[in-house]
A protein has these predicted regions:
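Phosphate-moiety recognition in structured ligand-binding domains
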Residues: 1-42, 56, 60, 65-68, ...
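Phosphate/oxyanion-binding active-site loops and adjacent basic polyanion-contact surfaces
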Residues: 58-71, 117-121, 209-217
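Gly/Ser/Thr-enriched, mixed-charge loops and adjacent short helices
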Residues: 2-40, 138-139, 156-280
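Glycine-rich phosphate/diphosphate-binding loops that line cofactor/substrate pockets in enzymes
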Residues: 67-83, 225-232
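Conserved phosphate/anionic-ligand binding catalytic regions in large, soluble enzymes, centered on
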Residues: 39-58, 150-153, 240-248
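N-terminal small/polar loop signature for handling phosphorylated ligands or for N-terminal nucleophile
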Residues: 15, 22, 76-80, 84-157, ...
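N-terminal glycine-rich anion-binding loops that anchor highly charged ligand groups
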Residues: 33-51, 69, 73, 77-78, ...
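Short glycine-rich or small-residue beta-strand-to-loop segments that form or flank ligand, phosphate
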Residues: 52-53, 82-88, 235-238
C-alpha cells in the first residue's frame, strides 16, 4: 500500500487510502498494549508520546498512565496551580483529552478546558500558561499544561504532550521521569491510577473553563504591529489545513480589522482534502 501511495504522491487520496475513524476510536478503548513490545510502551519524543491506537501505541491505558504520571511529576516539582489542557483536530485527541480529564479530576487537579469546546493550537495553550504565570501575584502557584496533539503526524495518530510552567516543551529530564512512571503504572495493570467517570470530571469543582482563543487573539498586538499590516492594505489568505487554528484565523481578521480570508475552514479527521505524500 505504501509503495502504491508513494507512486501517487501529489494526487488526491482514494477512499481506501483513508483511515477508518470508527476502527481507530474503537481500538483506542478496546485494545490493551503488549508491554513486551517496545513499540507499545510509553516513549516520549519532542515532549510528548505519539502513536496510533491501530498499532497499540496510543490507547486509553497509555493516556491514563501518562496523565497519572504527570500528576505525580507536577506534585514532586511543587507545581500546584491550574493545568491548562487543549486538543487538536486529530480523531484520537478528543477521547484522549476526556481520559485525561477523568484522571486529573480524580486527583483533585485544577484543570482549565476550552470554554468554546473547540480546538486549541499549541501556541495558544503555551500563551495561556505564560500569561497566567507572568500576571499572577508573587507566591501564586504556577500553571502548566497538556496539549493533546501529534502535531504533523498522520490522521491515524494521536499525541499527548506536557508543557511545564515555562510554557514550552518539557525537557528530557521531565519526559524521562514521566515515561518511566507511566510504564510502571501500565506494568502494574494501572493500579495507582486514580479515575472518575467523565461526567463527574466535567462537573467537578476543580474543572473550569478558559477562553484560549480570546486570550491569544487579543494579545497579538503585543508582539505584532497589526496596525501596520492593516494600514498597508495587505490581503491575507489563511489555510488552516484542517488543523487546530481553524477558528482562530477568522477571529484574528475580524477583531483586528484585517483583510483576511480563510480559504479552507474544513475540519476532517481523515484529511481527505489533502493530497498523498510520498512516505505515508
Amino acid at each position: 500500500m505504501l509503495d502504491d501511495m508513494a507512486s501517487r504522491a501529489g494526487t488526491v487520496a482514494l477512499p481506501q487510502d483513508l483511515v477508518d475513524i470508527t476502527a481507530l476510536l474503537d481500538a483506542y478503548f478496546d485494545v490493551t498494549p503488549d508491554l513486551g513490545d517496545p513499540a507499545q510502551r510509553v516513549a516520549f519524543g519532542t515532549s510528548g508520546h505519539r502513536g496510533s491506537s491501530l498499532k497499540s501505541s496510543f490507547n486509553e491505558p497509555h493516556i491514563l498512565a501518562i496523565t497519572q504520571a504527570i500528576v505525580e511529576y507536577r506534585g514532586r516539582q511543587g507545581i500546584t496551580g491550574p493545568l491548562f489542557i487543549g486538543r487538536d483536530t486529530h480523531a484520537l485527541s478528543e477521547p484522549a483529552q476526556n481520559s485525561a480529564l477523568e484522571v486529573l479530576a480524580a486527583n483533585g487537579v485544577t484543570v482549565l478546558v476550552d470554554a468554546r469546546h473547540g480546538y486549541t493550537p499549541t501556541p495558544a495553550l503555551s500563551h495561556a500558561i505564560l500569561k497566567y504565570n507572568r500576571e499572577a501575584a508573587p507566591g501564586t502557584p504556577q500553571a502548566d499544561g497538556i496539549v493533546v496533539t501529534p502535531s504533523h503526524n498522520p490522521p491515524g495518530d494521536g499525541g499527548f504532550k506536557y508543557n511545564p510552567p515555562h510554557g514550552g516543551p518539557a525537557d528530557t529530564d521531565a519526559t524521562g521521569w514521566i515515561a518511566e512512571r507511566a510504564n510502571q503504572l501500565l506494568e502494574n495493570g494501572l493500579r495507582g491510577v486514580k479515575r472518575i467517570p467523565l461526567n463527574d470530571a466535567l462537573n467537578a469543582d476543580t474543572t473550569g473553563k478558559f477562553d484560549f482563543l480570546s486570550s491569544y487573539v487579543d494579545d497579538l498586538p503585543s508582539v505584532l504591529d497589526l496596525d501596520a499590516i492593516r494600514n498597508a492594505g495587505v490581503r491575507i489568505g489563511a489555510d488552516p489545513m484542517g488543523g487546530a487554528s481553524v477558528d482562530y484565523w477568522g477571529e484574528i481578521g475580524e477583531r483586528h480589522q484585517l483583510n483576511l480570508t480563510v480559504v479552507n475552514p474544513t475540519v476532517d479527521p481523515q484529511w481527505a482534502f489533502m493530497t498523498l505524500d510520498w512516505d505515508e
